[in-house]
Regions:
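N-terminal glycine-/lysine-enriched basic segments
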Residues: 1-183
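A short, hydrophobic C-terminal helix/tail in secreted or cell-surface proteins
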Residues: 184-190
Length: 190
């Protein structure tokens, strides 16, 4: 049995490869925040009405051009734990809503960036989490207080959802069909 250099007991057992670097404390936080910011930067250029397409080279050698955040994230090969969390976040957003992946990732990236700044200034992580929870609660309350019934805007909502989905030639017809079927479904459900 190996003893520690001071003879007080067993020496620590090394469980990592000698070439593996081990980071702890603020170093881990900085790496996680840096990875979150980098992940957001991958999608930043595709965001908004002036967003640009990205050319992706897939592992099978094919190239794809898209500005769809979900498609871009699905093609990324990530190993970093923070990047894996962002891939999971993107998948959850896509599964729940079918859209909004880029916005979701950019928001999460900015929240992580701000969290990094606050942690560097000495804010305790539990206080940071509590603050984010309070901000979420206030945001949801504010959204509820400002929300209005859709009324006659449903057709415009359908048009907006269909834009960019290779439906431009039949946009008027499809948006009216969406309105008709959603109205029928609402009537059927009571």
């Amino acid at each position: 049995m190996a003893q520690s250099p001071d003879g007080t007991g067993t020496a620590p057992v090394r469980i990592t490869n000698s070439s593996t670097s081990v980071t702890s404390g603020i170093g881990v936080t900085q790496k996680l925040v840096g990875a979150a910011i980098a992940f957001g930067n991958v999608l930043r250029g595709t965001f908004g009405p002036n967003g640009l397409d990205k050319m992706l080279y897939k592992t099978n050698g094919e190239a794809a051009v898209t500005n769809d955040g979900a498609k871009i994230v699905a093609e990324l090969l990530v190993k970093h734990p923070a990047a894996k969390a962002f891939v999971s976040l993107a998948e959850s957003q896509e599964n729940a809503c079918g859209d909004g992946v880029t916005s979701c990732i950019l928001l999460a990236s900015e929240l992580m960036s701000e969290a990094g700044r606050l942690l560097e200034r000495g804010l305790h992580p539990l206080i940071l989490v509590k603050g984010y929870e309070m901000a979420l609660s206030q945001t949801l309350d504010e959204l509820d207080s400002r929300s209005k019934p859709l009324g006659n805007n449903l057709e415009q909502v359908a048009r907006t959802a269909l834009v960019g989905r290779s439906t431009e030639g039949a946009l008027d017809h499809l948006s009216k069909l969406c309105l008709l079927y959603t109205s029928d479904a609402a009537d059927d459900s009571g």
